[in-house]
Amino acid sequence: MNLHAAYIDYALRRSQHMQAEMSGADNVLLKDYQLFVAKVFLGLDSMNSLLLFQETGVGKTVTAVYMLKHLRFLYTSWTVLVLVKKALVEEPWMNTILRFAPEVAKDCVFMNYDDQNFHNKFFTNIKTVSARSRIFVIIDECHNFISKSLSREDGRARNTKHVYNFLARHIASSHNKLLCLSATPIVNNVREFALLVNLLRPGVLPPQSLFHNKRLLDEAELVSKLGCICSYLVHHEASIFEDVEGSELFARKRVLLKYVRMSAKQEDIYHKARAAEFRSGIAVFRVHRRMAATFAFDEFPVRKNLTPDEYDALVASLVRDFEALFAGRALSDATRARLRAGEPIECAASAEDLSLYQALYEHSCKYAEVCVAILASPGKCLVFEPFINLSGIRIFVKYLEVFGISYIEFSSRTKDTRTRAVAEFNRVENTNGELIKTCVFSLSGNEGISFLSINDIFILDMTWNEASLKQIIGRAIRLHSHANNPPERRYVNVHFVVAQLGSGAPSVDDDLLEIIQNKAREFSQLYRVLKLASIEWIHQHCREFAPVDDEAGFRALCSRAIDVTRGASTRRALATGENIWYAFSTLMITVHPGFKTEDGRVYDADGNFLTTMPERPIVRVQGTRLVYIFPELR
């Protein structure tokens, strides 16, 4: 990697005239890490692509705009194509450009990759690009673009894949540039890593699997051939299920699993939802169970023999019945005051209020318990609920009203008002939630926005992957996001709210937690590759190089094919030792059977080597089990 380091050194020398201040209608002083990335990417003309793998809140947009402002350092004529979700065009992109680099606005063409007609608009715009102009492409939240480029289940290519193929073929040619931005570049499966790499470095990654028994075949080969593929700035490398200590820049994170038992009515509806999924053949998606584990109407709405309009009318009537049942009802001021003081509901509530609470709990153990926890929180709260209508946010806000909790909503229902509402929520005067206590948000709010001074986040329903959950949590733990809080309140408690069945059988929430953890094991290995191949890691750790005076060999260095044909060798042997239990997190979401040999080697149940037992292992007790914790295996 020393040769990569030599080219980074060359880029920094060539771009040393670039200053940290960026001025337009407003001024901003770039952080050292932002200026470093810009100097390297613009200092190497033949560095055609770069991934900004940087966590939320560190200024990826500002870094990208700074690059646009200094493009003429390389060449006089550029066309800038910004591929972005529609919700993020005005804020942060256009706002940042107009504040700090208004002169480049005329060169920028914004296209929304979440537009159904995106591919046609893209190729229409490409045809208008002058032959004399170079192209600078920015893909914001590139994991979304990549996921839209994956083939469908039936093997048919999506329209976005045509845009992907064009970029892979043409951007790496000549002297065009491609900048991809993401805090979570891999979201759903490892195929996304292959697509991302072959977009940034076309043709270097072979079609063979990179894994054997969920372990990377050759980390060193990947790191060597992918040198300088990205900028890596991730302060919180730990799993979302691990606690993270705070720093001067970031708040402390503590993770809590909040188990709540379904009422008899909710559990009955849950089992009906499960049966309906299996009858209709959609059990794999778990949609009905997820909704029932969150909220249950008086009856389960069955689609059978109903037209779509009839089914919608049935659900609407159930919603109206629920809203009518609790219309005008609210907990007393005295009960709310005791709940804010931290008293349990059984002690805090009068007989009338307790009856009201139990009626709410009967429909949703999650909603009722979370409202109690919000009142007890000393600061502001976020509540994530992906479902909006039916039994989702529309119902949850009724719970907030009964509990007397002030709130804003950030979802597709509030497109016209949500940006202003977040600004009010983030005001210094509302640091402790005096004006607005809670923000309820859907997946609309997991990218591109910041929430300040949050003390508690409640995850009411699991997503299918850790990356989405990281984005959600990252909305509240950002650079200087808790600067207005006193030191003792610079923390964020993340509550994963898990519905439990009375029988003790795993619920849909338990299933999703296990799926998330299994995916995360492979993702974390690929993230480590990106870290070790990043320009920051190479610049800091590879110092034994001879300076270069040009970049003639850089493109060839980055075009070498990756060889993963060596595969994984397997050797059979008889070992003596003992059976053990192990987990990847102290939360022990999933506990696995394993085997420890007499010399301390640890294997999984299939005999695959995992790790060597440390001298002072982390051990936890779960029921009658002694469980070893191996967080490094994630």
From Swiss-Prot:
Motif (DEXH box): 140-143
Biological process, per Gene Ontology: DNA-templated transcription
Protein's recorded name: Nucleoside triphosphatase I
Listed GO MF terms: ATP binding; DNA binding; ribonucleoside triphosphate phosphatase activity
Function (record text): DNA-dependent ATPase required for providing the needed energy to achieve the termination of early transcripts. Acts in concert with the RAP94 subunit of the virion RNA polymerase and the capping enzyme/VTF to catalyze release of UUUUUNU-containing nascent RNA from the elongation complex. NPH-I must bind ssDNA in order to exhibit ATPase activity.
Hydrolase listed as a keyword: yes
Enzyme class of the recorded protein, top EC level: hydrolase
Lineage, top ranks: Viruses, Varidnaviria, Bamfordvirae, Nucleocytoviricota, Pokkesviricetes
Gene3D superfamilies in alphabetical order: P-loop containing nucleotide triphosphate hydrolases, Tandem AAA-ATPase domain
A Pfam entry, by short name: Helicase_C
Major localisation: virion
Gene symbol of the encoding locus: NPH1
Family: Belongs to the helicase family. NPH I subfamily.
Domain Helicase ATP-binding, residue spans: 41-203
